[in-house]
């Protein structure tokens, strides 16, 4: 389905940016933008779906929660035409673009949902491994961190998950992103990587989604390795329930929590 161009509210500029292999859009306030931080939003879609208008709505929410920070949303390349490492390469190019504009790593907050949440963690691992500045924080909503689909919740929530449950034909099991690469490669499935040196992370997940263990296991592993992590499991919630925006109590609470997390990062307080 082709969506019409997203028209931002009157208070915003939405600027298109052409990169070598993909495009990005920068959402910024027309008046008095906050340049203390910037949010790099990596969209979900199972590494097979392009950016959708919903993510520009997300960008507006992130702008509000961050007290007016700019939000950069890349439309990174996706499978099957562009399998791994295309998405990671484009996420890295987006991050480097922000560095070239004068932002320090600690001023950049990575935010992503589903595949985008996993991609945010993979990007952070790559940055650390290549001695580049890591971001100041990560917000991950229902992150997909285990493309082997081997976690406990893939079985326990199989009949509960309204989006991915009761079938082996979903993109969880039928996904072209890894290509010929090992699905346990940490840059594909961050769960199997090392989280040492990561910034603080906020991880939100629904209790009935098959990807529950992706979040729980990452949070436990990262904490063991000295990372500050806030894991919030929302009872009865489904995959990326934050797409309900402010229309249901749980989503409203999750967005408020994301705003509080950003405030914590800005004041450099304890999680």
Question: For the regions a protein language model found, what residue spans apply to each?
Answer:
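Alpha/beta-hydrolase superfamily serine-hydrolase fold, recognizing
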Residues: 6-271
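N-terminal targeting or regulatory segments adjacent to alpha/beta-hydrolase or S9 domains
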Residues: 1-2
């Amino acid at each position: 389905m082709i969506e019409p161009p997203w028209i931002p509210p009157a208070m915003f500029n939405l600027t298109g940016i052409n990169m070598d292999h993909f495009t990005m859009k920068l959402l910024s306030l027309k008046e008095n933008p906050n340049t203390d931080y910037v949010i790099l939003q990596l969209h979900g879609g199972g590494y097979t779906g392009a950016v959708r208008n919903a993510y520009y709505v997300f960008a507006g929410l992130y702008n509000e929660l961050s007290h007016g920070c700019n939000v950069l949303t890349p439309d990174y390349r996706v499978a099957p035409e562009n399998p791994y490492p295309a998405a990671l390469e484009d996420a890295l190019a987006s991050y480097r673009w922000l560095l070239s504009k004068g932002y320090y790593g600690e001023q950049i907050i990575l935010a992503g949902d589903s595949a985008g949440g996993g991609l945010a963690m993979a990007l952070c691992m790559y940055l650390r491994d290549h001695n580049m500045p890591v971001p100041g924080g990560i917000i991950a909503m229902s992150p997909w961190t285990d493309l082997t689909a081997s976690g406990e919740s893939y079985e326990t929530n199989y009949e509960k998950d309204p989006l991915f449950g009761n079938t082996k034909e979903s993109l969880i099991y039928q996904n072209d992103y890894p290509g010929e690469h090992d699905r346990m490669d940490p840059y594909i499935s961050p769960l199997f990587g090392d989280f040492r040196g990561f910034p603080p992370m906020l991880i939100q997940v629904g209790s009935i989604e098959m990807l529950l263990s992706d979040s729980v296991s990452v949070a436990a592993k990262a904490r063991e390795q000295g990372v500050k992590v806030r894991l919030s499991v929302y009872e009865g919630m489904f995959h990326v329930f934050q797409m309900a925006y402010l229309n249901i109590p749980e989503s409203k609470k999750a967005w408020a929590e994301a705003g509080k997390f950003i405030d914590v990062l800005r004041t450099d307080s304890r999680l």
